[in-house]
Regions:
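Signature of dsDNA virion morphogenesis modules
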Residues: 1-185
Length: 185
């Protein structure tokens, strides 16, 4: 299966929305934060209504299928993730969200209130929330003030973030002698 590296281009929009989805492509669910600490989703406090999750993980293969049924993987290098994260906020897209990438299900009263790129394996804030992901991972915190959306979180109908964006792709020629992870450490 072909693998493509995602490239941020100034001519493209980059990430312009982050959807709430049941099955995130990065295969990691968000956690919900209570007033005192991280708790199971079923016991979430109504007070804070914060969702914390990785948005993109560097060099993690993400399975895709195009309109013609061709299967392939994409990866986001660290430098692309950093540029996409910065551009997302620079363009003022922190209120752009929907359910399952459906433009008819645009969300109101949700905002990305915090975001960071993991830079430290020992002291990064993500560790406090139970995430053990590589440096270069983009994390975000969404404040949910919409009752209907919060109910979907509590019911487990949405479990993570998934980006919407426009990027260029560059095909990668993988060595037959090395595993995917070895080539992108």
């Amino acid at each position: 299966m072909d693998t493509f590296k995602v490239i941020f281009s100034e001519e493209k929009e980059g990430v312009f929305a982050i959807s709430l989805v049941e099955n995130p492509a990065i295969e990691i669910d968000f956690i919900a934060l209570s007033k005192k600490n991280i708790i199971k989703l079923a016991e979430v406090s109504e007070e804070k209504r914060l969702l914390i999750s990785p948005v993109l993980i560097p060099n993690q293969p993400i399975y895709r299928r195009d309109d013609q049924g061709n299967e392939f993987n994409i990866i986001f290098p660290e430098e692309t993730i950093l540029k996409a994260q910065q551009n997302f906020y620079k363009q003022g897209f922190q209120r752009n969200s929907n359910i399952e990438h459906d433009d008819n299900l645009t969300l109101n009263d949700v905002t990305f209130v915090e975001s960071w790129i993991k830079e430290d394996d020992t002291h990064d804030k993500s560790l406090k929330y139970g995430f053990d992901l590589p440096n270069g991972t983009w994390f975000a915190v969404m404040k949910v003030e919409n009752d209907e959306t919060w109910q979907k979180v509590k019911n487990g109908e949405v479990k993570g973030f998934s980006i919407e964006g426009n990027f260029d792709l560059e095909k990668i020629n993988l060595s037959n002698n090395m595993s995917f992870k070895e080539q992108f450490r």
